[in-house]
Structure formats: structure tokens, C-alpha cells
A protein has these predicted regions:
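N-terminal glycine-rich FAD/FM-binding segment characteristic of electron-transfer flavoproteins
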Residues: 1-172
Length: 172
């Protein structure tokens, strides 16, 4: 991003366990900066849940538009378009807001040599988690209990079905 025109870049130095944690740290950091638009990818490379943008918006109490593939900003308003089943949905929203990008929002730009060299002079601020002032505390992270396997019965074995429903499932 620095090589194609961004003025500054920030990286929050974490190894997250969940999209919720990523969203919390992004929102805590963003609250310390001036912004009009918080732009995220449709899916994150860490968890692919397509949920980080929505959680950032919720933590910051901002409007959220997902899967945006067209964006026009005019003053304090933005017009957003996104593909939906059967057509295109167009929305208007006031700045600031959170947006998750879909394919087609921007053309990929390959940086030229001058941009790459200039990027080396621009700062990449690495933010330590303890400097964010976040109230996030991971108490526990555990997997759900393992479910029992599926039992296959012959179509005509009603006696076995009734026995399982009565003795194991306890529904009859």
C-alpha cells in the first residue's frame, strides 16, 4: 500500500485466535485515529469468516456495508453498490462507516520502481497490543464437545429405530 500512495501503514502485532479478537484490536486502534472510512477485505486471510468488518462496525457503533464492489464518496456521503442475487443493490451512507470490499471495488495496481523506493522511506508503525489500551482479556478458548457418530439403519428395521428413539434419544 505504501508503494502505491498510502501515507502511512500500521500493523498490530498479534497472533489472534479468532476474528472477534482481530476486530476488537482493529476497532481499539481505529478509535485513536481520525478516519472517514474503515476498509476491510471481504474475507480475512487469518480466518476467512467474512465477519471481521461487521464486528469492527459493531464495536465502533458505525454503519456497515458488506461485499461492496463500487464506491463513490461525495463530501460527507457515500454511494455504495454491491451485487446481490438477481441484480445490484445501491445504498447511501453518511461518513464515517465500515466497508468490506468485494472483487471489483478497485483495480489491482502494480507499484513502479519509484513507488517501491519511496515506500522504503515511509514508516511502518508496528503497534504492540499492550499499547492499545484494550480491555480485551481472553478467559478461555475451547472446542465444543465431540458429538456422537451417526447410526445407519436399514429402511425396513422399525424395531431397531423404535429401540434407539426410546433408549438412546429418549424421545418416545
Amino acid at each position: 500500500a505504501l508503494a502505491i500512495g498510502a501515507d502511512a501503514a500500521f500493523r498490530i502485532d498479534i497472533e489472534p485466535d479468532s476474528s472477534w479478537e482481530v476486530a476488537k484490536y482493529i476497532s481499539d486502534f481505529a478509535k485513536t485515529k481520525a478516519y472517514d472510512l474503515i476498509l476491510l477485505g471481504k474475507e480475512t486471510i487469518d480466518h476467512n469468516g467474512s465477519e471481521t468488518g461487521a464486528m469492527v462496525a459493531e464495536f465502533m457503533d458505525l454503519p456497515y456495508i458488506s461485499y461492496c464492489n463500487k464506491l463513490d464518496i461525495d463530501g460527507t456521503k457515500a454511494t455504495i453498490a454491491r451485487e446481490i442475487e438477481g441484480g445490484t443493490e445501491t445504498s447511501e451512507v453518511n461518513l464515517p462507516f465500515v466497508l468490506s470490499a468485494a472483487k471489483g471495488l478497485a483495480e489491482q495496481r502494480i507499484p513502479n520502481m519509484k513507488g517501491i523506493m519511496d515506500a522504503k522511506k515511509k514508516p511502518l508503525d508496528i503497534i504492540a497490543v499492550d499499547k492499545l489500551g484494550s480491555d480485551l482479556e481472553l478467559v478461555r478458548f475451547e472446542l465444543p464437545p465431540v458429538k456422537s457418530g451417526v447410526k445407519m439403519l436399514a429402511v425396513d428395521d422399525m424395531d431397531a429405530l423404535i429401540k434407539i428413539l426410546h433408549e438412546e434419544a429418549k424421545v418416545i
